[in-house]
Amino acid sequence: MPLYDYGNTRLRARISKLFSFPTLESFAYLTSLDSLISQLSKTHYQDAIQIALTYAHGYGCISDALRRKLIEIQDNLRRFYDPVIWEKIKTIFLREDVKNIKSIIRGIIHKTQPRIIINSLSPLGVIPEQYTTRIAQAKNIQDAIDRMSVYQLEFAPSLLALKGSDRFASSAELERVLEFWYFSKIEQILKGSGENIDLLRKANMIEIDITNINTLLRYVDAPDSPETAGSTIEHFLIEGGSYSPKYLINLSHTNLISDVIKKLAGKKYQSYLMEALNCYQETQLLSEFENQLRIYALRWLSLLPKLSPFGVGVPMGYVALKKSEIRNIRWIAKGILSGFEPKFIIENIERIQ
């Protein structure tokens, strides 16, 4: 696939420079953030660290450098690939936009300080950062959606259509509209056939599954939640995943999370859901399931550069691997800052290969 040759060659070189797990584990034994900064400055993080050091130190320096490396991911892919190819690859980053807007909506509804909302946003989205910053500073949801409309964001009309309805101020309903817009948009982009389209569709199916499973678990855990009151689960389910909406609707009548997981676990996510269930039984946090499903998706993506070395699998895998590396460095930095034992830091390093 000639259109992918140049970009894939460049990305394979970058994949070869990613930190091995023994290297990440060695960082956990460092006794200070200054030592970690020193070590990172001798690696492919050198430029980002040097820039960050001009106006930050300690964790602030590391956080700024990691943010720069995240932004660099999309910048590189734009440069390395033909615009036609980029339109397909861009679907990876559109998901980040949806997550960012959902975070903004939740933050505004719960009256979170704009600074905190802005700091939680991923720089990997396609929407310009100055737009998301301005939206996060809105005084209320109405103002936020008006700003989305002014910036001509594609999903703004769908959100504006809710104005005047009883569900307008509902985070769950606004997020539902965003999810439906996103998956409809991806379906339009991924029309056609071929190996590359098939890979992107499989990735999209995993996202649908994760969205639907999380929706199902929230319903079972809190069927009378104010966020979902007055709506059936069918209202929130996305078509096109591994599980039919009918099957998920039937499961929503199950009383216990553990029973739902055991019925879901016969599919490809079995070991991940069961691992999450073990953790959930200790913590009672539904985020255990979301995290394990995210790990499944990252591991699937991380294999693509080897399984599909001549097409879109390389950029898909590279993005997953780089995001995971950055997440691990951030965790190690926080662990050192908090004074955690090296063993504990190492045990919680994300391993997707």
Region roles according to the model:
Residues 1-353:
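N-terminal domain-start signal
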